Amino acid sequence: LLASSAASDVYKRQVIKFTVALTAFLLINHNIGYMEKISSTPIALILALICSILPVGGAVFIGSVLILLDMYALSVEVCIVALILFILMYILYFRFSPKNEYGVLLTPICFGLNIPFVMPVGMGLLRELYSMFSLVCGIVLYFFLNGVKQNETTLGGVDEKDAATSKIVVALNQLLGNREMYLVLAIMVVTLVIVYIIRKMSIEHAWAVAIIFGILFEAVGMIAGDMVLGISGKTITILVGSIISCVIAFVIQFLFFNLDYSRTERLQFEDDEYYYYVKAVPKAIVAGTDKKVTRFSGKEEQDRMTKKRFAEEMEIDEDLLD
């Protein structure tokens, strides 16, 4: 049974990696597929199959190569700017957030699907604070590529006098002069921090509260920020994207943190040095009769337990008792 379960997990991971990689490659081909030889669906399928047997970082690397080739087909100057950007991103990524490859891939994908708000909420629920660096990389990458797409006529024009310098300035301006990108970076990073802090709190329905606060902060912040920057026509998109992101976030909660608060147990016990007061909330997928809960009192010296024994008895992480 264990072998069968392990094999099933391997296949599931491969399917997930294939799906994410294929979606990323198809979006690259659709939006910036300037090199026609590599911008076909069969090529995307083959590369996604290769990525399914590689670590997730393999998809990030292959996606970077595809983008650089497309940028080269558009303009050598844009390719150089993109290469410098990727080098800086890889330094930031490998230094602070090497185990959050999905964040780098999924963030531009979610932007392309108009549901970017799910990323800071989802990462705040499932990851640690340092995952914000992969989120930042994904946001910067999306806005750079989107800016290149919007200015492809200028960037892909025939070389003229001073044209090379002009192309570099236009490419750099997609990053350095993009006020909307700075707005999105600030709001999404703060959202991730808010969601992370709330879901760590010892309150009932912490994940649900974190999701609601996070989505509301993003929606209100983006609408207000767009008004300040004079960006119009995005309110409906923001509201619809927020609703869809909220639904996805609650699906994440159901899959990873589905608790039954109606069966909450408050426990007290002691060891030689401390008294412990613990609130134990069972998972909703576990039947009430499947778990035996033993209550410990300071008056029952024979039932004293160390934190380690208690954690083993309750099948919880010992660190949760700290």
Task: Describe these PLM feature segments.
Residues R13, T23-L26, S40, D226-K279:
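Alpha-helical transmembrane segments of multi-pass integral membrane proteins
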Residues M35-I38, M71-I84, N178-A186:
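Structural signature of hydrophobic alpha-helical transmembrane segments
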Residues L49, I62-V136:
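Membrane-interface helix-loop-helix junctions at boundaries between adjacent transmembrane segments
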Residues C110-L113, M119-S242:
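Generic multipass alpha-helical transmembrane bundles of integral membrane proteins
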Residues L259-K307:
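Short, highly charged, low-complexity non-transmembrane loops/tails of multi-pass membrane proteins
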Residues Q302-D322:
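Long, low-complexity, intrinsically disordered segments
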